Every structure is written in C-alpha cells, then in structure tokens.
Design a protein with these regions (language model features):
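All-alpha prenyltransferase/terpene-synthase fold signal
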Residues: 1-296
C-alpha cells in the first residue's frame, strides 16, 4: 500500500481519537485527549509506521505502537509547558493543557498518558508475538525514562544561564540535551517500527543512526524557526529560550552556522538512506519540508 504524509496523518488521527474515550472521571480523559489530538505533523508515529513498511512489515501491525509513541510525545509536551518547566501558554496555536484544565490536572494527565500508552501496545497488538511486544515495551521504557527524554528535560532545565565559558563543554551539554530530549523519541519510533517488521540487528542499528541524526537536525531546525518565524507560523511563544538564557544551537553558533549544521545533518540522513538502500518517499518529503521551512 502506497502511503503519503496526509494518509498517515489521517490514519493516526483516527486511531488516536478511537484509543482515548472519555470516561469517568471525565476531566482527566478530556485533558489527555486534548493534547494528544491537537493538530500536528505526527512525525513520530509516521516514522514508526514508515520504518515498518520500508523494512517489509505490515503498517496495521505498527499502528498501536505508533499511537502510543504519539501519546508519550504528548505527555512530554504537557509537562514541558508547565509553569515549573518552560511555562508556555500556547502549543500548536492553542492554549496549553494547564491553561485549559489547570496545573494539577495537567500533571496528572501527563502521568496518565505515560502509563496509558504501553497499555495501548499490549491491548491492540494482537498480530505481534509476546517476544516482540516485550522488546517494544523495553524500548518504550528505556527512551521514556530517566536515561531518555526525562534526562534531556533535566539537562534542559539545568542549562539555563550556564556559567561555562568553554565552548567544547557547551557543545557536549547541548548535544546530550537534544539527543535525549528530541532524538530519543525518533529513535523509539524507528527502532520499534523495525522490530515490528522483524528486521535484523544491522537494519535496527542503521535506522537508529538515522533517527539520532534526524532528531538533532529536527532540533536545530526548531531553534532556527524560533529565530525566524512568527507566532502564526509556529503556534507558540517565540524567543523564550533566548530570554531565559537557555542553550540552543542559535545562541551557541549563531543563525548562519546553525543552518550549515542543519544542512550537514540532513545530508548525513540522506547518506544513511542511500548506503542502506532504504527507499522512502515519505522520509524524503520530511527532509525536504525541513529544508524549505528553514530556507537552506
């Protein structure tokens, strides 16, 4: 089956709506569903589904895992936007979760999604073997936890107004931050997609390298867009990282050098695809869209 970005987005949106039904106590499920179903690019579930398809698996088998990863992503956004974290009022052009439901419910909705997501994997992955499901859950807990996106969030908080002059030390911190805060969910998406397709270890390592590189490129692009875009284009408050003295690619390297680094990262992604003979119009489309939006 040939799928494009819009096909994937429609599929994921329909399933996300199906997987989270409003039940008692309604406020928690409404809060969970609010952020999960906000309009978005759905890159992480798309990359899970497309990796599975690209490596010979069935898209249908990967849908629960792909949607679980989007729920995990939504959880990170809810908590990231909280006043005690980044204190953002808007996400994707809409009020952030705590602005709609209050801080207490937002915290609990994030916690709920963190545990709700793996339940989706175990409940709806009937076509996968128990061993495959255990492998997928292990990947989920690894990238979701204290050695994954949480580690990235901690370093992000601690990077505010860093009193470090050494450029190499700053680069090391910046890379660690973005590998864990951003790349880890892309790695989770592609690694689980490969596992569902029953790919061998070499293919899993190849998609891991692609995902890690793409995640860094995505974060550089995000930093660039924060500098050159408007609220209407991004749907969120701009310039907050700079105001708060956070470490970003643009604050460390400047706009033009950041664009050069982005171009190199995207070229490396294409090299990995070519070397492995991976064929994917969707991945090419994603890379080209980033180039277009950032003007490189």
């Amino acid at each position: 089956m040939k799928m494009n970005m819009n096909d994937y987005i429609e599929l994921v949106n329909d399933k996300l709506d199906e997987y989270i039904q409003i039940e008692y106590p309604q406020n928690i499920f409404k809060s969970m569903k609010y952020t999960v179903t906000l309009p978005g690019k759905r890159l992480r579930p798309i990359m899970c589904l497309e990796t599975c398809k690209m490596l010979g698996g069935e898209i249908e088998d990967a849908i629960p895992t792909a949607c679980a990863i989007e729920m995990l992503h939504a959880q990170t956004l809810i908590h990231d936007d909280l006043p005690c974290m980044d204190n953002d009022d808007f996400r994707r052009g809409k009020p952030t979760n705590h602005k709609v439901f209050g801080e207490a419910i937002a915290v609990l909705a994030g916690d709920a999604l963190l545990t709700y997501a793996p339940q989706i994997i175990t409940k709806y992955s009937q076509n996968l073997s128990p061993v495959a499901i255990i492998r997928i859950l292990n990947e989920y807990f690894n990238f979701a936890g204290a050695r994954g996106v949480i580690a990235g969030q901690v370093v992000d908080i601690e990077s505010e107004n860093l009193n470090i002059e050494n450029i190499e030390e700053k680069e090391k911190i910046l890379k660690y931050l973005h590998i864990h805060k951003t790349s880890d969910l892309f790695q989770l998406a592609m690694r689980t997609g490969a596992i569902i397709a029953d790919a061998d270890d070499d293919k899993i390592e190849a998609v891991t390298e692609f995902a890690k590189t793409f995640g860094l490129a995505f974060q550089i692009a995000d930093d660039i867009l924060d500098e050159i875009s408007t609220f209407e284009q991004l749907g969120k408050t701009l310039g907050k990282d700079k105001e708060e003295g956070k470490l970003t690619y643009v604050t460390l390297y400047g706009l033009e050098e950041s664009k050069c680094k982005l171009s190199c990262m995207l070229s490396k992604c294409c090299d990995i695809m070519n070397k492995q003979n991976f064929k994917s119009n969707v991945f090419e489309q994603i890379i080209n869209e980033i180039k277009k939006r950032t003007g490189i």
